[in-house]
Amino acid sequence: MMDNRGNSSLPDKLPIFPDSARLPLTRSFYLEPMVTFHVHPEAPVSSPYSEELPRLPFPSDSLILGNYSEPCPFSFPMPYPNYRGCEYSYGPAFTRKRNERERQRVKCVNEGYAQLRHHLPEEYLEKRLSKVETLRAAIKYINYLQSLLYPDKAETKNNPGKVSSMIATTSHHADPMFRIV
């Protein structure tokens, strides 16, 4: 029995309609993909009133799929892109704008890498670096600059010999700040 505090107007049981009260549904209703999806879920859902409610006269899924001949009869996007083999296509104006945004994004990323390359020492500018090589060189250079700023911390790390050899090697060059070994 239901609690009468919140929903006092709800009946205890759902009404049962006789067979004469059922109205036949149109064929287009049967073929509508979203209706079919909601009316015939993948897994059956049990209901506490399943014994008392009559079953609606819907055709089986195989009948629906067999009569569904148009490749893409609906003009709205489906929740799943490849639902029943139909892909929603955007208009040409939308595609052009999307492609232009992507070109702008790639251009900005490439400009960022170009600016990063100009902050690296000259020895890295001898050849054109890939994006991965640019990032690795920047990491090495940042670590080198940190070792110059904080030599005590650099010597206490895992490779104290490597840091001291970097500092010793740079002392032979005219401008030690831009040399990395």
Swiss-Prot record:
UniProtKB keywords: DNA-binding, Nucleus, Repressor, Transcription, Transcription regulation
Region described as Helix-loop-helix motif: 107-145
DNA-binding is among the record's keywords: yes
SUPFAM superfamilies for this protein: HLH, helix-loop-helix DNA-binding domain
Keyword Transcription in annotation: yes
Compartments in which it is found: Nucleus
GO molecular function terms listed in the Swiss-Prot or TrEMBL record: DNA binding; DNA-binding transcription factor activity, RNA polymerase II-specific; DNA-binding transcription repressor activity, RNA polymerase II-specific; protein dimerization activity; RNA polymerase II transcription regulatory region sequence-specific DNA binding
bHLH domain: residues covered: 93-145
Location of region: Basic motif: 93-106
Tissue/organ expression: Widely expressed in fetal and adult tissues.
Gene Ontology biological process terms, A to Z: positive regulation of transcription by RNA polymerase II; regulation of transcription by RNA polymerase II; salivary gland development; sensory epithelium regeneration; tissue homeostasis
Gene3D superfamilies noted in UniProt: Helix-loop-helix DNA-binding domain
Subcellular location, principal: nucleus
GO cellular component: chromatin; RNA polymerase II transcription regulator complex
Transmembrane segments: none
Subunit-structure text: Efficient DNA binding requires dimerization with another bHLH protein.
Functional note: Transcriptional repressor. Inhibits myogenesis. Plays a role in progenitor cells which differentiate into ductal and acinar, but not myoepithelial, cell lineages in the salivary glands. Involved in the functions of the microvillar cells and Bowman's glands and probably, in a non-cell-autonomous manner, in the development or regeneration of a complete olfactory epithelium (OE).
Protein name (Swiss-Prot/TrEMBL): Achaete-scute homolog 3
Gene that encodes it: ASCL3
